[in-house]
Regions:
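Helix-enriched interaction subdomains in cytosolic or periplasmic regions
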Residues: 2-3
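Conserved PLP-enzyme active-site core in the AAT-like
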Residues: 6-179
Length: 184
């Protein structure tokens, strides 16, 4: 659906931003083995994305959740440290602003701070719940969406538009331009 396409688009921008312009010419063959971080609650689009981008599903490091099924940031930090020690490049953390099965909202502010410290792309899958950020009663973590490098939204969930209405928001528009522009 539109949400899957929006999320994949955001991770393509992350791949280009982190691995550089050479990834377009050389593919992944000269790139370090990369890792993506997400919980088991993350929608299945992520497996599709890493497969389509040539990383393979083994590039996903699954982060534990807390009792509310939100990403455990202590475990996330440990996973990142362990992967760095093993020689992997932490490429992106994927948080959920409302999971499909439970509506759980990951601790966005804490994840953003960790990603900033670690210099890792921070993506939010907001297809299911990001639209709720406009509500005065929105949870504090939904009010922090602007801390992400990219956010995917899907207007057919809450905004009553037809399917294939995915949207990608990025902190720096040049990441999308650099990813998809071709010189003629």
């Amino acid at each position: 659906s539109g949400g899957t396409v929006a999320n994949i688009t955001a991770l393509l921008a992350a791949r280009r931003a982190v691995l550089g312009a050479e990834v377009r010419r050389d593919g992944l063959r000269n790139s370090p083995q990369s890792r993506f971080y997400a919980t088991v609650e993350t929608h299945a689009w992520l497996e599709k994305a890493v497969d389509m981008m040539g990383f393979g599903e083994a590039a996903i490091t699954r982060v534990e959740t807390d009792a509310q099924l939100r990403m455990d940031t202590v475990h996330l930090a440990a996973c990142i440290a362990e992967d760095r020690k093993a020689g992997y490049l932490p490429l992106a953390v994927v948080a959920s602003a409302g999971t499909v099965s439970t509506g759980a909202i990951d601790p966005i502010k804490a994840i953003a701070a960790l990603c900033c410290r670690e210099k890792i792309w921070f993506h939010i899958d907001g297809c299911y719940g990001a639209a709720a950020a406009i509500l005065p009663s929105a949870p504090a973590d939904l009010q922090c969406l602007g801390l992400a490098d990219s956010i995917a939204m899907d207007a057919h969930k809450w905004l009553y538009v037809p399917l294939e209405a995915g949207c990608v928001l990025v902190k720096d528009k040049n990441h999308l331009v650099d990813t998809f522009a071709h010189e003629t």
